[in-house]
Amino acid sequence: MYALGDWRRTHYSSEVNSEMDGQEIIIMGWNHSIRKLGKLVFIILRDREGTIQIVAPKQKVSEETFATAKSLGKEDVMAIKGKVVANEKAPAGFEVIPIEIKILNKADTPLPLDPSEKVSADIDTRLDKRFLDLRRPKIQSLFKLRSEVLKSIRNTFHDNGFIDVDTPKLVASATEGGTELFPISYFDKEAFLGQSPQLYKQMMMAAGFDRVFEIGPIFRAEEHNTRRHLNEAISIDCEMSFADEKDAMEILEKVINNAFTDIYNNNQKELQTLGIDLKVQETPFPRIEYTEAVDMVNAKGVEMEWGEDFSRPAEAALGEMMDGFYFITDWPTEIRPFYTLPNEDNPKLCKAFDLMYKDLEISSGAQRNHKYDLLVEGIKRMGLNPEGFGTYLEAFKYGMPPHSGWGVGIERLMMIMACQQNIRECVLFPRDRQRLTP
């Protein structure tokens, strides 16, 4: 008992089928469920790829194997060497008759959470016992989709000439001058966890890297306690030289469209497990100007002044009128970050955009201000001290090209794709205002 020995898995559950009739296999996983019917034991073994039925008839297996089968408890870890037997009456058209069963570890009882989902639990209980919650097939399917989405996004970036970079997550000042920072002890200096790779992405444009992307953690000390906010998230960021905001939106559309297309083509099993009928939206996505969006919100009976950001009621009103992905463009300069480039013909508006999905903000982006003097003016206009951005500003003195970019939170993207109402469902171990463990 408990020793793997020289056994190694030959197949995942999904790889076994009735055409393997008579073949000997080794499968490994957890005891998802068990039924003991006198001289017959039915075991459902669960692994990463699904479940498989093992049938142990007393008259066809050794006495030791039958006794081991009967002794299995729920969520015990096991390895089974057995023979595939085609059986039209079996749910999958076959079953596995065990030759030998190894119990690799026993699970304590009672279980604090039921991975078979026969007993429901609220989200706080599930997150407290997340290691058990993550065994649930639906949850595993969601994170398989997440992995494939990130793979698709990386492929799209590489196919379009972007270089993968990693920027510091320990920083000396705020990216956008805000107070939403987590301070940390950094020897004898003041430091913070990075809230965005924005300034470093722009410095890479000055370095001549032309097109870069990064997928990494961001930290924001926002006191939101909603189903849409996290204090630690994974951000997908890109920056591109010699490009305006329209070029940035085009790349963003391509990234989103390719991810949805790849998932639709390659991950129907996971989509079916989650009960999702995935739709791939055609590009280009609709575009509406900020001023038009404000008028639409007011027409819905939600009061909003020009120059304000969209409140939750305003976003909800837009979501009732707009279906799927769409861009909001031409924002007021005063409410966008200091590095956003104003329009030449109307400086009150800037070359910024948000990507929305119904009422949910997915991404913010813009063409950036690449002129040193104008950037310093923008910093001062926001009530910030340019001296706090010395290293960043220096990069603009020696030939910074025009550039644009954006950032997307993978968790919000997965909320859309996996039809989740709570962003915590899309994170292995979420960090929010109340939760620092597990």
From Swiss-Prot:
<dbReference type="GO" id="GO:0017101">
    <property type="term" value="C:aminoacyl-tRNA synthetase multienzyme complex"/>
</dbReference>
<feature type="binding site">
    <location>
        <position position="368"/>
    </location>
    <ligand>
        <name>L-aspartate</name>
    </ligand>
</feature>
<protein>
    <recommendedName>
        <fullName>Aspartate--tRNA(Asp/Asn) ligase</fullName>
        <ecNumber>6.1.1.23</ecNumber>
    </recommendedName>
</protein>
<dbReference type="GO" id="GO:0005524">
    <property type="term" value="F:ATP binding"/>
</dbReference>
<dbReference type="InterPro" id="IPR045864">
    <property type="entry name" value="aa-tRNA-synth_II/BPL/LPL"/>
</dbReference>
<dbReference type="GO" id="GO:0003723">
    <property type="term" value="F:RNA binding"/>
</dbReference>
<keyword id="KW-0067">ATP-binding</keyword>
<comment type="function">
    <text>Aspartyl-tRNA synthetase with relaxed tRNA specificity since it is able to aspartylate not only its cognate tRNA(Asp) but also tRNA(Asn). Reaction proceeds in two steps: L-aspartate is first activated by ATP to form Asp-AMP and then transferred to the acceptor end of tRNA(Asp/Asn).</text>
</comment>
<dbReference type="InterPro" id="IPR004364">
    <property type="entry name" value="Aa-tRNA-synt_II"/>
</dbReference>
<feature type="site" description="Important for tRNA non-discrimination">
    <location>
        <position position="91"/>
    </location>
</feature>
<dbReference type="GO" id="GO:0006422">
    <property type="term" value="P:aspartyl-tRNA aminoacylation"/>
</dbReference>
<feature type="binding site">
    <location>
        <position position="361"/>
    </location>
    <ligand>
        <name>Mg(2+) 3</name>
    </ligand>
</feature>
<feature type="binding site">
    <location>
        <begin position="220"/>
        <end position="222"/>
    </location>
    <ligand>
        <name>ATP</name>
    </ligand>
</feature>
<keyword id="KW-0547">Nucleotide-binding</keyword>
<feature type="binding site">
    <location>
        <begin position="409"/>
        <end position="412"/>
    </location>
    <ligand>
        <name>ATP</name>
    </ligand>
</feature>
<feature type="binding site">
    <location>
        <position position="220"/>
    </location>
    <ligand>
        <name>L-aspartate</name>
    </ligand>
</feature>
<keyword id="KW-0479">Metal-binding</keyword>
<dbReference type="GO" id="GO:0005829">
    <property type="term" value="C:cytosol"/>
</dbReference>
<feature type="binding site">
    <location>
        <begin position="228"/>
        <end position="230"/>
    </location>
    <ligand>
        <name>ATP</name>
    </ligand>
</feature>
<dbReference type="InterPro" id="IPR012340">
    <property type="entry name" value="NA-bd_OB-fold"/>
</dbReference>
<dbReference type="InterPro" id="IPR002312">
    <property type="entry name" value="Asp/Asn-tRNA-synth_IIb"/>
</dbReference>
<dbReference type="Pfam" id="PF01336">
    <property type="entry name" value="tRNA_anti-codon"/>
</dbReference>
<dbReference type="Pfam" id="PF00152">
    <property type="entry name" value="tRNA-synt_2"/>
</dbReference>
<feature type="binding site">
    <location>
        <position position="361"/>
    </location>
    <ligand>
        <name>ATP</name>
    </ligand>
</feature>
<keyword id="KW-0648">Protein biosynthesis</keyword>
<feature type="binding site">
    <location>
        <position position="176"/>
    </location>
    <ligand>
        <name>L-aspartate</name>
    </ligand>
</feature>
<comment type="similarity">
    <text>Belongs to the class-II aminoacyl-tRNA synthetase family. Type 2 subfamily.</text>
</comment>
<dbReference type="GO" id="GO:0000287">
    <property type="term" value="F:magnesium ion binding"/>
</dbReference>
<feature type="binding site">
    <location>
        <position position="361"/>
    </location>
    <ligand>
        <name>Mg(2+) 2</name>
    </ligand>
</feature>
<feature type="binding site">
    <location>
        <position position="364"/>
    </location>
    <ligand>
        <name>Mg(2+) 2</name>
    </ligand>
</feature>
<dbReference type="InterPro" id="IPR006195">
    <property type="entry name" value="aa-tRNA-synth_II"/>
</dbReference>
<feature type="binding site">
    <location>
        <position position="364"/>
    </location>
    <ligand>
        <name>L-aspartate</name>
    </ligand>
</feature>
<keyword id="KW-0030">Aminoacyl-tRNA synthetase</keyword>
<dbReference type="GO" id="GO:0004815">
    <property type="term" value="F:aspartate-tRNA ligase activity"/>
</dbReference>
<keyword id="KW-0963">Cytoplasm</keyword>
<dbReference type="GO" id="GO:0050560">
    <property type="term" value="F:aspartate-tRNA(Asn) ligase activity"/>
</dbReference>
<feature type="region of interest" description="Aspartate">
    <location>
        <begin position="198"/>
        <end position="201"/>
    </location>
</feature>
<comment type="subunit">
    <text>Homodimer.</text>
</comment>
<dbReference type="InterPro" id="IPR004365">
    <property type="entry name" value="NA-bd_OB_tRNA"/>
</dbReference>
<keyword id="KW-0436">Ligase</keyword>
<dbReference type="InterPro" id="IPR004523">
    <property type="entry name" value="Asp-tRNA_synthase_2"/>
</dbReference>
<keyword id="KW-0460">Magnesium</keyword>
